[in-house]
């Protein structure tokens, strides 16, 4: 997916600040779970998932440009009550940042983590990395 840079993402060193990349990853994740055309609302993921942790690795700096960045997103590590989203962010076709987010489904009424439903696992398997079948 394409993610635009914002002028305010730039820091005093004239490149995109490191914290902005978590926002770009969030944009890709929201698109996958909420806005993606293949999402037919068969899962409860839209009703509650929370971030348990992030990992991010910066491969090269990114300077502000009107051309949007390209973010690839996929899923791995589907477990009973958690899964991981992975990201690769490209600037002008060059890999600039990689990252991952551990996500946990939550029952907000009980304020507790919950297990993934079979339907949610089917949905997540659509975006599973080929080497990580669940």
Language model: regions and residue ranges:
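Terminal targeting signals and extreme-terminal segments of soluble enzymes
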Residues: 1-70, 76-134
